[in-house]
């Protein structure tokens, strides 16, 4: 392991579960990534690598999971113990946004694990009380409010399903602009032209990025997810 770098990965696993062929292959892919910090969205704990330390954002994102009680919108796996774990419990970020800290070989790191709502969240399904993009924008506001309270001496990594392609594709300009405003304090390492992109699963931080690698949402046996996954190698500024 390179003690000067931190490996961070994220993937939306499209509710892979149980002992199905897809779930087995998804779990294998997550293991092969060998990340230090792993954010899995739309997943469950049995997909995560063995060992490590796990936190999730809870079950209250406004959809009934009675028949699938192990589902989580946002899961965080860490090679090292997690502290200061907190999840949003109100608003659009409830069950979707999780913050934690860990002490890695590169030093203390804060993680913001997210599954920002997609455009139609709670519009015609779930609570049915939202308008297009309203949940997404509210969640962005909540992430911004969290970030304003962060100790700037501790590096921050934001990872998960952002539900936007960057640069903007089809989303309204106001939605793209709002995400850019929220992310302005960090560098979005996964924006632009990358293999298997453009991505909506992203990693941003105030660390330096030395590597971005993606994998597709399918393998030789078929579909794994409707998202591509991504891993970044990060290091403190001025190291190496």
Regions from the PLM with identified roles:
Residues 14-16, 44-46, 82, 116-119, ...:
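Short, solvent-exposed loop/turn segments at secondary-structure junctions
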Residues 18-25, 92-93, 131-142, 224:
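Soluble or luminal CAZymes and related metallo-dependent hydrolases
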Residues 7-13, 26-49, 111, 142-170, ...:
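Active-site beta-strand/loop signature of hydrolases that rely on acidic residues for catalysis
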Residues 85-90, 116-139, 166:
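Surface-exposed cleft-lining segments at the edges of enzyme active sites
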Residues 31, 37, 42-118, 217, ...:
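Structured beta-strand-rich core segments of catalytic domains in phosphoester-bond hydrolases
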């Amino acid at each position: 392991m390179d003690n000067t770098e931190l490996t961070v990965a994220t993937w939306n696993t499209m509710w892979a579960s149980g002992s199905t062929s897809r779930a087995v292959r998804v779990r294998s892919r997550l293991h092969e990534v060998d990340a230090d910090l792993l954010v899995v969205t739309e997943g469950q704990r049995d997909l995560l690598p063995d060992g490590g330390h796990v936190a999730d954002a809870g079950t209250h994102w406004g959809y009934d999971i009675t028949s699938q009680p192990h589902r989580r919108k946002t899961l965080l796996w860490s090679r090292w113990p997690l502290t200061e774990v907190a999840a949003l419990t109100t608003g659009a970020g409830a069950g979707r946004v999780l913050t934690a800290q860990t002490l890695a070989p590169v030093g203390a790191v804060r993680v913001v694990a997210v599954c920002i709502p997609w455009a139609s969240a709670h519009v015609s399904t779930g609570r049915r009380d939202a308008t297009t993009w309203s949940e997404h924008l509210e969640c962005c506001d909540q992430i911004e409010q969290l970030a304003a309270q962060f100790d700037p001496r501790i590096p921050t990594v934001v990872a998960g399903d952002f539900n936007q392609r960057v640069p903007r594709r089809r989303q309204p300009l106001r939605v793209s602009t709002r995400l850019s405003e929220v992310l302005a304090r960090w560098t979005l390492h996964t924006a632009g032209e990358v293999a298997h992109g453009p991505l909506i699963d992203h990693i941003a931080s105030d660390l330096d990025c030395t590597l971005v690698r993606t994998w597709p949402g399918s393998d030789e046996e078929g579909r794994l997810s409707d998202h591509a996954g991504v891993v970044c190698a990060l290091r403190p500024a001025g190291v190496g």
